[in-house]
């Protein structure tokens, strides 16, 4: 059989010789004048390797092997049967990549990938608790997509500090190579491939940071690409009104499958939660399939202990906290107007600094006094809480520069007095003393968290006698990697860290103890901190110790908030509403402290669907475990080139001997893309015969009587019909998604170009840029049209091959 272009038609499973080596065809796609074949090596030098060839430019010879079954020993037959069953997929949506992944099979981690392959959605929010393996779940989705579509492309957007961790996890868990694209790598790729090729389109799987992607020139390069999978890690940082959020929205609108990862999806702001849930919903009707598992749901081995240690303040610290509270509440009363939001933000920063350390408070008061010497206009637009999207460990000067009193001279006098009190208290800090005693007693590795970098420097001095390393947002990537290496390899006992420097890290193999020097006013940060050591794989009971200053707002409000937060998250999971900084500040500094800060479930957002795929995941996990046990320590299946038969006798003799035939059926689309490799078993009795010779067994199983032939044809027809019916909802969803992507490409192209290009009278660069963007758009729309055509062809399913794999006579 030949194609329209005169090329020989190849089928799945055909043996060919290309470039002097033997290959088995795994995928054949024909175009007008050429054909692409994906192959797996089955020769002595290329066994189990994968390659792609282009016909007719790569010449090939078809290898014809005998289809006559081979009578084999019981051991050989058992090997072939087990190998065949291990590779079998009970459904077209069964996972293919999970069996070969280097990870323990935990059922709930399979749920998102199962939902993706079944077509339950195109947008996914994985909101599991910290430490439950969201990276593994997203990695499974990527690996599964690349296994099913060898030409698929995926991109992972992660905080800069987590890029190396993502690369190492993908390599270790899934044997996937994912280069980190930054300015240097993009420049070298562009120089290598030429100016006419988009460097972002060269690699199949890439990792980059949101701060790099948000650059205008990078967004221009990415706007003309459609990705099969887009993963947004720490997605709760991408919901505000910022360049980061704009870049995330643009990429989300170009994702066939969008995966949002965050342990803290609802940070207390309903509007930001709604924006998170609307990412990638360009058409307005695409559901957000959500998964949320608490530690109890996941069956974590050890329950975390989180004791509060009440620290008695010194007399100087008590005076400092009392004076600061008086000042802060006075500012709070005098700045009730929205135009004075900056003053409230400033005093909330001072309160948080005081809970961290007296020295940290003194430094901020010094800066505030200096800034109040040059007061900006009172009607200037001021930021509201929280003042950053990423939780930096140093606040900008603009935060501390808003006056809080109507009488500025009076405020400066109050601040000068506070500064002297704070300097006195800094000479003997109770929390630092308590921390030193605690660390000396536990005698094991620990992570000490604080919100502020200057407090971190104070701790470094206090623990100069201990092997300690620092991790904060001001470190370069090599410095950060060196610090982590010292700690994880056991060369440092203490890791002194801020939230910005440590987000997303896996440190559970090194220690089980986290110590919080202060309680952050964003309560979800406590969960993020504990998640560094409280993760799947932790072999001991994790501890998260909170130091609380007695007689301060930490004890009065924040400690109670932390206790209630833990209880409500145990009940409602990570989607529970929690307060943001603004609500916490109102509770601490308002005239009537509020203790109703914690709400119930998150607000209803249209289109958010909580999917329960536990039953399917349990079945899939059992199948994968069995498949692993059947192929462990055995050779490759690529040497199974002929069907095998055997004659087996049972211990208990049966009254009627039986024959079992197992056929392999390959179902493809009209274009030749393999959709499902299924097995069809048939059984028949052998009446009037008690014992069989070898020759009789071979003849009986090799022959294909008319009755068996009709059964095979009927089974194939049922497979095609059932597959078409089960795939129809998924095809409709994928088709609608592709149409939305094409519409978003057209709509955003003109808007983005207009915002980034300023035409010059004598400079033609803008015109060249528009031409380049138009070319990218045309190419992206062409690929989208190809995708729609492939989806249409997927509705026309057919049997590519059906052949006997193994058979047996049982008596």
What is the meaning of each model-derived region?
Residues 215-216, 268-269, 456-457, 481, ...:
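SF2 helicase motor core recognition
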Residues 522-540, 544:
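Conserved SF2 helicase motif VI
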Residues 304-313, 363-493, 801-811:
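Conserved Helicase C-terminal RecA-like lobe
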Residues 226, 272-275, 506-518, 543-546:
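A short beta-strand element within the Helicase C-terminal
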Residues 72-80, 540-683, 687-692, 731, ...:
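C-terminal accessory region of SF2 helicases/translocases
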Residues 195-196, 201-202, 206-227, 237-256, ...:
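Inter-lobe coupling linker of SF2 helicases/translocases
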């Amino acid at each position: 059989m030949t194609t329209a272009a005169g090329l020989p038609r190849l089928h799945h499973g055909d043996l060919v010789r290309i470039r002097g080596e033997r290959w088995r065809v795994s995928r054949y796609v024909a175009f007008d004048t050429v054909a692409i074949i994906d192959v797996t090596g089955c020769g002595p030098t290329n066994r189990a390797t994968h390659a792609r060839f282009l016909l007719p430019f790569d010449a090939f010879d078809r290898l014809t092997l005998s289809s006559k079954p081979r009578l084999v020993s019981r051991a050989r037959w058992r090997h072939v049967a087990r190998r065949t069953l291990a590779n079998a997929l009970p459904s077209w949506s069964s996972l293919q990549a999970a069996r070969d992944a280097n990870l323990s099979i935990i059922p709930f981690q399979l749920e998102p990938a199962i939902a993706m392959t079944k077509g339950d959605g195109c947008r996914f929010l994985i909101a599991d608790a910290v430490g439950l393996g969201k990276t593994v779940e997203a990695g499974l989705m990527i690996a599964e997509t690349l296994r099913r579509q060898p030409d698929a492309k995926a991109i992972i957007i992660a905080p800069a500090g987590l890029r190396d961790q993502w690369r190492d996890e993908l390599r270790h868990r899934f044997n996937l190579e994912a280069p980190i694209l930054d300015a240097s790598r993009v420049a070298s790729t562009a120089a290598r491939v030429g100016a006419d090729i988009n460097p972002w389109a060269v690699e199949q799987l890439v990792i980059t940071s949101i701060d790099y992607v948000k650059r205008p020139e990078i967004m221009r390069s990415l706007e003309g690409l459609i990705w099969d999978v887009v993963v947004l890690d720490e997605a709760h940082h991408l919901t505000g009104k910022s360049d980061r959020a704009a870049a995330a929205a643009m990429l989300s609108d170009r994702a066939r499958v969008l995966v949002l990862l965050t342990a803290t999806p609802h940070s207390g702001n309903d509007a930001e939660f709604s924006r998170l849930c609307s990412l990638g919903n360009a058409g307005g009707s695409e559901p957000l399939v959500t998964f949320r598992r608490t530690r109890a749901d996941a069956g974590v081995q050890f329950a975390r202990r989180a004791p509060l240690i009440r620290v008695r303040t010194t007399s100087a610290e008590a005076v400092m906290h009392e004076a600061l509270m008086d000042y802060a509440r006075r500012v709070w009363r005098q700045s009730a107007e929205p135009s004075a939001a900056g003053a409230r933000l400033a005093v909330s920063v001072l309160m948080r600094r005081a809970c961290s350390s007296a020295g940290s408070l003194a430094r901020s008061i010094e800066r505030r006094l200096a800034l109040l010497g040059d007061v900006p206009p009172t009607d200037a637009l001021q930021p509201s809480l929280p003042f950053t999207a990423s939780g930096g460990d140093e606040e900008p000067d603009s935060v501390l520069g808003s006056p809080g009193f109507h009488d500025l001279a009076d405020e400066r006098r109050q601040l000068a007095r506070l500064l002297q009190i704070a300097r006195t208290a800094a000479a003997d800090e109770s929390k630092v003393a308590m921390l030193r005693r605690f660390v000396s007693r536990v005698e094991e590795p620990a992570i000490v968290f604080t919100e502020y970098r200057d407090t971190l420097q104070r701790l470094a001095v206090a623990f100069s006698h201990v092997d300690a390393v620092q991790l904060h947002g001001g470190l370069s990537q090599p410095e950060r990697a060196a610090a982590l290496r010292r700690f994880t390899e056991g060369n440092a006992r203490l890791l002194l860290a801020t939230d910005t420097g440590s987000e997303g890290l896996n440190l559970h193999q090194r220690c089980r103890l986290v110590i919080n020097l202060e309680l952050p006013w964003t309560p979800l940060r406590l969960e993020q901190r504990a998640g560094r050591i409280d993760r799947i794989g932790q072999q001991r009971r994790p501890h998260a110790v909170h130091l609380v200053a007695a007689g301060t707002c930490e004890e009065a409000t924040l400690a109670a908030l932390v206790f209630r937060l833990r209880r409500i998250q145990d009940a409602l999971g990570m989607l529970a509403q929690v307060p943001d900084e603004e609500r916490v500040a109102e509770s601490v500094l308002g005239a009537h402290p509020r203790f109703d800060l914690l709400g119930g479930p998150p607000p209803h957002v249209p289109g958010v669907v909580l999917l329960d795929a536990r039953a399917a995941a349990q079945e899939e996990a059992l199948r994968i475990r069995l498949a692993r046990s059947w192929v462990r320590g055995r050779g490759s299946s690529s040497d199974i080139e002929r069907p095998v038969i055997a004659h087996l006798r049972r211990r208990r003799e049966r009254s009627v001997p039986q024959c079992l035939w197992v056929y392999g059926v390959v179902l493809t689309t009209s274009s030749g893309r393999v959709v499902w490799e299924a097995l069809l078993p048939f059984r028949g009795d052998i009446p009037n015969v008690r014992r069989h010779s070898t020759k009789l067994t071979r003849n009986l199983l090799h022959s294909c009587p008319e009755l068996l032939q009709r059964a095979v044809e009927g089974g194939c027809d049922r497979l095609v019909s059932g597959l078409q019916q089960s795939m129809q909802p998924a095809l409709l969803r994928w088709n609608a998604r592709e149409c939305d992507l094409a519409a978003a490409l057209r709509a955003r192209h003109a808007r983005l170009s207009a915002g980034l290009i300023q035409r010059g009278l004598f400079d033609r660069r803008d015109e060249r840029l528009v031409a380049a963007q138009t070319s990218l758009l045309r190419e992206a729309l062409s690929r989208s049209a190809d995708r729609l055509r492939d989806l249409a062809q997927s509705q026309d399913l057919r049997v590519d091959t059906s052949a006997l794999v193994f058979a047996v006579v049982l008596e």
